[in-house]
């Protein structure tokens, strides 16, 4: 889907991703330029930002208490190379970016932000499961049918 929109990673981020010799991406780290780019503030909603859907905001307001927030991380793994990990947390680290909307907060570390910037966090409630999901990720080339794993554009 995202490939059809012609969106891609920046050159700095592309250089920072190192594929495993067999071609599967297992992990990545960002260089100084890519880290600055991932953590820089931008007024445009799509550039370096994470958008929250109304259903995400509503669900977070229901389940969080006090200083709790939703943490979004990207880890190596899953059937497509990378996977999204959601958890409730109360500690904001120095390299974290906080995205707040309507009193609900989603926090993303700078390494993970490079893989999800411009994406949207949603809460989906279906007959068989309810979950937070990352939608419309411009950094993802393809994802698996479960929606929790993806590969990045190189």
Swiss-Prot record:
The keyword Calcium is annotated on this UniProt entry: no
Keyword Nucleotide-binding: no
UniProt binding sites for Fe cation: 79, 144, 146
Chief site of localization: mitochondrion
GO cellular component: mitochondrial [4Fe-4S] assembly complex
Keywords of the record: Iron, Iron-sulfur, Metal-binding, Mitochondrion, Transit peptide
InterPro entries: FeS_biogenesis (IPR000361), FeS_cluster_insertion (IPR016092), FeS_cluster_insertion_CS (IPR017870), HesB-like_dom_sf (IPR035903)
Residues of the transit peptide: 1-8
PROSITE patterns in UniProt: HESB (PS01152)
Annotated function: Involved in the maturation of mitochondrial 4Fe-4S proteins functioning late in the iron-sulfur cluster assembly pathway. May be involved in the binding of an intermediate of Fe/S cluster assembly.
Assembly with partners or alone: Heterotetramer; forms a dimer of dimers with IBA57. Interacts with [2Fe-2S]-ISCA2 forming the heterodimer [2Fe- 2S]-ISCA2-IBA57 complex; [2Fe-2S] cluster binding is absolutely required to promote the complex formation.
Family, similarity comment: Belongs to the HesB/IscA family.
Name of this chain's protein: Iron-sulfur cluster assembly 2 homolog, mitochondrial
Species this chain originates from: Pongo abelii (Sumatran orangutan)
Source species taxonomy: Eukaryota, Metazoa, Chordata, Craniata, Vertebrata
């Amino acid at each position: 889907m995202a490939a059809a929109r012609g969106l891609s990673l920046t050159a700095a981020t592309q250089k920072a991703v190192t594929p495993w010799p067999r071609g599967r991406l297992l992990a990545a780290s960002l260089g100084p330029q890519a880290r600055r780019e991932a953590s820089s503030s931008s007024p445009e909603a799509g550039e370096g930002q994470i958008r929250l859907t109304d259903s995400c905001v509503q669900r977070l307001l229901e389940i969080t208490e006090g200083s709790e927030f939703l943490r979004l991380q990207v880890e190596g793994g899953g059937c497509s190379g990378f996977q999204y990990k959601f958890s409730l947390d109360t500690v904001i680290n120095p390299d974290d970016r906080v995205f707040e909307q309507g009193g609900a907060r989603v926090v993303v570390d700078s390494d993970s932000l490079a893989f999800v910037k411009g994406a949207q966090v949603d809460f989906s409630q279906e007959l068989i499961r309810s979950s937070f999901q990352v939608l419309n990720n411009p950094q993802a080339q393809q994802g698996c049918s479960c929606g929790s794993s993806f590969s990045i554009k190189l």
